[in-house]
């Protein structure tokens, strides 16, 4: 960010990233490398606002190296369609007062970019992801899949830019 005199950086949906090799969390017969959300990098402590109103479905502190750190998942209902949004790599303090079932208004501060020591050891950023079906998961859902799993995961996790509408600004 400093080299480009930028306040924020954006990482896109469906990017095939080799940087996940740094964590055993993404290892296996076939390494997970395909990104399922949008990342927004910036200074630790940057406020995170709810993109849509919704109910707190679940939250967790996913503390493994390379994981999300503090994570919040909201449940949304638009007409007859229910879906979730995941906010990852937040500050641990952000989940200390949450409770499941609480309503969050659109534009409400729901978190802050966490420091590396609490966000999975990543540079401070937000991972934002849309998820149709959580398959009974609470406070966590894969943000990266293998190439061979792409069709299933991309079908369940549409491009988060459908909500954020910000990739048009990426050069």
Can you describe what each PLM-predicted range is?
Residues 1-39, 43, 149-171:
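Polar/charged, compositionally biased leader and regulatory segments
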Residues 28-65:
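Short, glycine/small-residue-enriched coil/turn segments at secondary-structure junctions
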Residues 35, 76, 89, 125-127:
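Histidine-centered active-site/metal-ligand motif
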Residues 40, 54, 74, 107, ...:
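Terminal peptide-recognition signature
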Residues 44-47, 94, 100:
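Short, conserved secondary-structure segments in the cores of folded domains
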Residues 50-94:
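Zn2+-dependent peptidoglycan hydrolase active-site motif and core
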Residues 57-71, 108-125:
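Flexible, gly/ser-rich surface segments that form the specificity/activation loops bordering the active-site cleft
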Residues 96-108, 115-118, 122-171:
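Acidic, glycine-rich catalytic/binding loops that coordinate metals and/or anionic ligands
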